[in-house]
Amino acid sequence: MTATGSGPLAGVRVVELAGIGPGPFAAMLLADLGADVVRVDRPGGAGLGIDPQHDLTNRNKRSVVIDLKAPDGAARVLRLVERADILIEGYRPGVAERLGVGPRECHARNPDLVYGRMTGWGQDGPLAQRAGHDIGYIAVTGTLGMIGKPDEPPAVPANLVGDYAGGSLYLVVGVLAALQHARADGGTGQVVDAAIVDGAAHLGTMIHGMMAAGGWQDRRGVNLLDGGCPFYGSYRTSDGAYMAVGALEERFYDEFTELLGITEQAPARHDPARWPELRAAIAARFGTGTRAHWTAVFDGSDACVAPVLSLREAAAHPHMAARGTFVEHSGMTQPAPAPRFSVTPGSVRRGPARPGADTAEVARDWGVPGIAEPQNSEPQMSELPKSGPRTSASQQSEPRITHDRRAGPHQRGNR
């Protein structure tokens, strides 16, 4: 099995200090695009409770096990750092420093390193030292309060909006931008502070603009894109399934109402006072047929209607299947790498890394034979941090990108 692929990040080396949630997902994105990601697992695992062979966020990576609380733990990680482009960590602020692998120690070994920090609350602020999870982060940014019906509690969007959209994706953008700077003439490494609260808030930029212009009410379930509009929402079918409707533009709306058979109610689109009447007409009509029936009715149209599928159903959808949006690897159906590149495509090259399984291989490929030697796992009490590495599903590691270190520490790669 190859260590890296032919994706656009081939040759980029990433050290990921094991965590759960957005940090590992960010590192997976980099690995999917060809980066050589080495995950530093802790003895006993990260505490996610998932069998490592099913943890898809660790695909395309290699793993070594290092006890950072042991006397030589930090030194082993720093040997990897010398040859890395990116480091990702998701501890609470100050923990990496107490473990001896904070930005100061890492940049002393490798000034060009992009040091990515993934947390929920950020590196500073009144809540920086508090525990948290996705739902709390999106709650205080106003994001959670936007989702759901006006007379019901906010709907919980799994952990996709905070952990992965507001966290992982912003971390990846940040470290890639920092890598570009580090590789520019006169550039250097730096710290990327990726906080889920910052990213989740940033996702709402357009909504804030609409609110300032008077086009968005600061309450859920009454606006154009939050379910308040009857032609942008989901409707139950006769078999208990759902169809999603997004017929916003008038020409799409006209096609939608014609195919649904409610042209008489179509003019209600222009009168919000009649929206309850329009919603009732749409709901009643969808309730007369199954999901399969309505899928066939709208197939090939520009009415912007789609069946609401389950996770297991999605891979078999004709469009998903034609594009290869899902792939089979390591006995599991899983999303293929995204986005797609015409010249340097990413791929799923290897299954989820098993803790410590690749130590000898990494020691050879990265030129750090010392990490393959037995570790003294008994920590000296003076070297233990006041509190061990604590991560939540949202306080994860962050990715960093630097240059090729194959010739040794401090050498810049070709620009």
Question: How does the language model describe each region?
Answer:
Residues 141, 167-190, 202, 206-214, ...:
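Oxidoreductase and adenylate-handling cofactor-binding alpha/beta cores
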Residues 226, 231-301, 305:
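Aromatic-enriched alpha-helical interface/lid elements that frame and gate functional surfaces
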Residues 37, 299-313, 369-371:
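Short, well-structured beta-strand/strand-turn elements
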Residues 121-122, 196-201, 239-241, 247-252, ...:
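Glycine-rich beta-alpha junction loops
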Residues 123, 152-161, 183-200, 220-227, ...:
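Conserved Rossmann-fold dehydrogenase catalytic segment
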Residues 47-53, 311-357:
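Active-site-adjacent capping/gating segments
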Residues 1-185, 353-354, 358-375, 401-415:
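N-terminal helix-loop segment corresponding to the beta1-alpha1 unit
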